[in-house]
Amino acid sequence: MKKICILFIIAFVSCTPNKETEQERWEQHAKNTEIIRDDFGVPHVYGKTDADAVFGLLYAQAEDDFNRVEQNYIWAIGRLAEIEGEKSLYSDLRAKLYMTEKEAKENFDNSPEWLQKLCVAFADGLNYYLAKNPQVKPSLITHFEPWMPMYFSEGSIGGDIERVSTRKIKDFYDADTTKMAVSDGLIRLNDNEPRGSNGFAIAGSKTKSGNAMLLINPHTSFFFRGEVHVVSEEGLNAYGAVTWGQFFVYQGFNSKTGWMHTSTGTDIMDEFEETIVKEGSKTTYKYGEELKALDSIPVSLKYTSNGELKEKTFMMYRSHHGPITHANGDKWVSTAMMWSPIKALIQSFTRTKKSNQKEFHEMMDIRTNSSNNTVYADADGTIAYYHGNFIPKRDVSFDYTKPVDGSNPKTDWQGLHALEDNILVLNPPNGWIQNCNSTPFTSALEFSPKKEDYPAYMHSFPENFRGIHAIPLLTNASDLTIDSLIDLAYDTYLPGADLLISGLLDAAKKSPVKSKEAKEAIELLKNWDFRVSVNSIEMTLTQFYLNAYSSSGKIPRMEGNKRISALGRFDYMSKLATPKERLEIFQLSLEKLKVDFGSWKTPWGEFNRYQRNDGEIFQDFNDAKPSLAVGMASSSWGALASFGTRFGKDTKRQYGTSGNSFVAVVEFGDKVTAKTMLAGGQSSDVNSPHFSDQSQRYADKQFKEVAYYREDVLKRAKTTYHPGEEKK
């Protein structure tokens, strides 16, 4: 009998497949993956399979900026309070309201096998990096898990969830109503710079070669995305910008298609006021003639306090509309938004592998790209613009700009609009499409969609100065090349400055200019062409004038019951304010300039600077440290090439923090060609040659040529290695 048992065990073991260990999986991925770093440190990652390529991509990202990779996941998965303390508990709770860790794991388990492999490869790439680099000490996450990408399935900064107030979450879920500061949890910059992007798609009728072209110009925080090239033998060959920690190229191109995202004004989130009925220990809410039970989910969150790790337990609530995020009086409010992480990851990754507009359109039919528009161009000469993607159907008799009555079934979302119902521009006869986070109804001149054809909830963004700036440039353009499209995208005219200073000059005609210096400054402004440059004294005068106006409290915030638009604020300063008020505030700006710089005759480049001192997420700017003059300006002025800034703690100068970060201009033909720019450099390591090798190029608008095809990559190769090996 004993012999029979032994034989049975041997037979069972021999028939059971050996489960590959994590270490064995790492080694196999590394063997199948090659990383070639070019002369700017851009990683060109070659993998046998898509999973191998993802493994190498995440390994390379960790090499370049592990801190930001980890920080993005600490925030996304809801563990920020373990580092930042109790103030971040409600950012963590917000993440769990939409998906618990258990649900994230279930989503991973329910994903198609190919997506599971990519998620495992994501975790393997980061864990292998940590194993091979023990000198790197994570802040919190010592082992990455394959379910984590379910929390970070879309490439925007924060995505939609950032719009859910952590303060309101605290007020609802925490009986302690102290005035404790609450952190949003996002890597957010306090620079008041409009977040957004520019996307231009150019048809062959407007280009010298006859090929379609694409401008990829996201306006994001500096160093928020790296530049990568990721290739597999399974059809992946994508180049562009990747948000740290994600395994797909978010803004970029392959050999046949290119995609660029701009922020959308589509209404993709709604609030439903729930009428709560308590029956003993049971909490229900009214829905038509019935009472529905609220889902009650306990969650325990950890936070650090005085060097100790503590824990707090919350009872989370969800209705069929979404999680309860706050209360309006006695009504509990559910906040509904797109939350389909599996489908979102599928759309984000498969987007990078499409070969033509038909395939791209089919991918867009997944309809999970909720916070963005998409500008598109391809090698067939097609150009297109998709305004929004995830758009719930609604009963237009209700006003969804305000919370709606959740007890009325008629307010429920009625599924999603079909892709064909959404705003789309395809191959307009004018030969170009533009979107600068502005209205879709000026995207292609008279060939733009018509506002009256779409429900109001499909669009909300008004026209802005960037859109006003772009339209005549594109209309008048011809025989465009990569270089001339770069010049167009960096056109230095500022329509906002034109409007503001024209109003000041008009005031000087109607009201006496009292000081000698004001008279002299106004004479200088009379001859200005409203173009920004490092030598422009006029630009400095204009910025200080706007700063003085903004801090004066004179600009109205509301127009009726609506918040006044950016164009409306400029209209007030240039047209509606009295001439006397305009001149008085201009005098204040001159006095501020003299205090800060000793003279009002200060060139723009003396004031407007680029500085990168270290790899920290938040730069501690210092006027005494080296910096570069930058002849760009904020997108608030209508600058297409945006340079958003903030002051340091004790600085007189302003320093760039956002705007043009990764920029690409792409031409599609028999072969794809492109030039790119990355603010600063590829690496966050101050000792790396690629920490600041693009800084002066950034200031000088000197783009680099992209090495896309392997023969070109090899010509530019500086180091070649498998993950885990020493670079050669």
Where do the language-model regions lie?
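Bacterial Sec-dependent N-terminal signal peptides
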Residues: M1-E22
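C-terminal/peripheral segments of proteins
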Residues: P17-D506, S511-K514, N527-K728
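A cross-family structural signal marking well-folded subdomains
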Residues: E520, L525-K526
